[in-house]
Amino acid sequence: MTERIALFPGSFDPFTKGHLDTVERASRLFDRVIIAVMTNAAKKPLFDGPTKVALIETVIADLDNVSVVAQPKTLTANFAQAVGARYLIRGIRNANDFEYERDIAALNQTQDAQLETVLLLAKQEFSFISSSMVKEIAAFGGQVDQLVPPAVAVALQEKLKHGRD
């Protein structure tokens, strides 16, 4: 039987509890899940790629079939082919996410017709969390403990504290 490999691409800036829930659920559906920290040219990241990879590795340490890689400046479909992934994992929080992901899935199909996008609906308790909002809350000194894993919360506090100095 062919190994079912899924790719979970994203900028993960920062990695949230919603991302973690999506990865945990995907890890039960697939033989292997690769989290790909991608470069989004439209976003200005708070954390660099190696820092994001290190944080995510800490958070997912107990998930034996999940790994993390930094893959800057490449098309997701091309990277999926390079690592043998036939599935893309995407978390959906709302109708806007669905519309966006449907269009991206169609574009990915133009690059690789065999690449399937699997949409996982966010659990209610994570449906309002976005990395952008987490950064904004943290930047103004708000509490992010309920929104991100503990290691990420600490890294956010440290990064923003040093960024203000």
UniProtKB/Swiss-Prot annotation:
Keywords: ATP-binding, Coenzyme A biosynthesis, Cytoplasm, Magnesium, Nucleotide-binding, Nucleotidyltransferase, Transferase. The keyword Thylakoid does not apply. It comes from the Bacteria. Its EC number is 2.7.7.3. Coiled coil: none annotated. It is found in: Cytoplasm. Transmembrane segments: none annotated. One of its GO terms (cellular component) is cytoplasm. GO terms for biological process: coenzyme A biosynthetic process. The record marks 19 as: Transition state stabilizer. Its main location: cytoplasm. The keyword Cytoplasm applies. Homohexamer. This is Phosphopantetheine adenylyltransferase.
